[in-house]
Amino acid sequence: YSIDEHRTKDLFFGSIFGFIYITVLISFLIRILYFESESENQFHGAYYIIFLLIVTKFSDMGAYLVGTLIGKNKMIPHISPGKTWEGFLFGCLTFAVGGGAIFYQIFQEKMLHLSWGDVLLLGLILAPIAAVGDLAESIIKRSLKAKDSGSILPGIGGILDLIDSVLFTAPILYLYLYFFS
């Protein structure tokens, strides 16, 4: 019986990384969900999560839409060949701030910890972080020589493809709420 030491290390560290990457980062969604309003002892965390999802997903959609329409300059073609600087700068940031602002306008009374300035700043902060999350998942897929992270959702690329950017933006929103609200 022989043990392939290199493969064993890869499997071990891959398992540890997978655990940390998914469970630790996604746990911030639970922290946001139960983020308490000090003045009323109420939980409005679901509104913050919806805000996060809108900003993050509008960022992804805006980058894709603008990048597809006018994108010419590839961001990092060896990692994610479809991403362009035009999509990132114009689509990602505009859609993230716009989506967040629209949601905040509708549910402002439930989001006691955020002001208009916070919403605009978070849109500008979370949009690039969402892109980093998407690129990080692309790096993982490239290293595994996989096009998609799974086959459960045909045409979308897998569940990890849906939550990759949220995994990175959730901790940032939680820390922002914790330290600045």
How should each PLM-predicted stretch be described?
Residues 174-181:
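Juxtamembrane boundary at the C-terminal end of a transmembrane helix
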Residues 1-125:
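Membrane-embedded alpha-helical bundles of polytopic integral membrane proteins
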Residues 1-3, 166-172:
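C-terminal halves and exits of single transmembrane alpha-helices
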